Each structure stands twice: as C-alpha cells, then as structure tokens.
Amino acid sequence: MKIDILDKGFVELVDVMGNDLSAVRAARVSFDMGLKDEERDRHLIEYLMKHGHETPFEHIVFTFHVKAPIFVARQWFRHRIASYNELSGRYSKLSYEFYIPSPERLEGYKTTIPPEQVTEKISEIVDKAYRTYLELIESGVPREVARIVLPLNLYTRFFWTVNARSLMNFLNLRADSHAQWEIQQYALAIARIFKEKCPWTFEAFLKYAYKGDILKEVQV
C-alpha cells in the first residue's frame, strides 16, 4: 500500500507483523488464555485502550518506506521508540528533488509579498543550491561536504519500523493541528494504513486514547 503525499513524497507499507488479534493474544497470555469469539476479542481491545494497558499493542509491528522533506524527517525522528535507516548523502549522489510549497499553502498568512513570489523565491534558491552542489562534486569535493549547501526542503527517504503503541503516540502528536501542516499529511497517511491493517485497534484508539484533533474530523 502506497500513498502519495505533498508534491513528491509518499508513505509505503513495506511489512506488517501481526494484527488486532496479536494484541488480544498478548494480553490473554497473562491468564494462560488465547482467542475467544469476535465480540469478546474486540471488547478486550477496547478495554485495554480505555484503561491504558498499552503493552499488548507493542506486538503489532509496521515497517514503512517514507519519502519526505528533510525538515519533516527531522521532526519524525524525534519519535525515538522505533528503528530508522535513512538515505545517505555521504554514499549516494542526491537527486534534484525538493519540496516546493504551493501558493495555497500560504493562504491565511499575512505575508508582505504574494504567495506566488514566495514559491518563486524558494525555487530560485533551490536551483542555485543544487547547481553549487553539482559544481562542488565535479570539482572533487567529497559528497559528505558538498551536501551541506542543500536546503532542508530536499527530499530524503527512510525506513521506519515501529510498534503499534509507538505509532499511536506518533498520531497523537502529529495528527494534530498543532503539528506542522506537512507532517500532518504524513500522519494522516499512516493513520489510513493503520486503520486498514488494525481496524479494531484504530477504532478503540480514536474512541479512548486519541489526544489530537484532526483524525476525527478527516475521513482516513
């Protein structure tokens, strides 16, 4: 499952281990019990979520491939209960792929120049920075040094492996109007995938544990 985001980004589900029933099994092992019928299994997930018994959800694990601007990735990497591997600008020549916000992104802000000019200025700086990057590489400057001229709207790619408990914490903080708009879009994509793979857990999360303010308003 792959969801396109922003102008060139995406979130792609690479792998998932477990589902709603994984949390049920993990919770019932305390009583040396397993699965029961669907109604009682689903009720248990709601009970766990309502009362803050979160460790059973750590047995559901997702791996995502994410393409995002560097400034989004740096916010993402603050979520430390996860595993990350990122594209290296030291070992790879970086492509001309930059996030350019549309003029609509700036609607509602009191800028002293038109939004269209903001977009043009960002594009001009990006062009100059990338030309400089290529010139440095062609001059024999190592990639690890040449890359420092590139701005934060450069796209990077990374793998993110995270359990469902930590994923829900990510959604609490990033699927929220206080988060930057760009990372909100990625959080909405993560929520869509989470909902598809773990519908009972997602529903219980929204009902009892979600602290943000956009998932309930947006169809995910």
Swiss-Prot record:
The residue ranges of the ThyX domain are 1-208
Q: What class of enzyme is it?
A: transferase
Q: Where is the active site?
A: R174
What the entry lists under InterPro entries is as follows: Thymidylate_synthase_ThyX, Thymidylate_synthase_ThyX_sf
Pfam families in the cross-refs: Thy1 (PF02511)
Look up the EC number in the record and give it: 2.1.1.148
Please indicate if the UniProt record lists Transferase as a keyword: yes
Keywords of the record: FAD, Flavoprotein, Methyltransferase, NADP, Nucleotide biosynthesis, Transferase
Q: Which domain of life is it from?
A: Bacteria
Q: Which family does it belong to?
A: Belongs to the thymidylate synthase ThyX family.
Q: What does this protein do?
A: Catalyzes the reductive methylation of 2'-deoxyuridine-5'-monophosphate (dUMP) to 2'-deoxythymidine-5'-monophosphate (dTMP) while utilizing 5,10-methylenetetrahydrofolate (mTHF) as the methyl donor, and NADPH and FADH(2) as the reductant.
Q: Which NCBIfam families match?
A: thyX
Matches recorded under PANTHER family: FLAVIN-DEPENDENT THYMIDYLATE SYNTHASE
- Subunit structure, briefly? Homotetramer.
Protein known as = Flavin-dependent thymidylate synthase
Q: Which organism is it from?
A: Thermotoga petrophila (strain ATCC BAA-488 / DSM 13995 / JCM 10881 / RKU-1)
Gene assigned in the entry: thyX
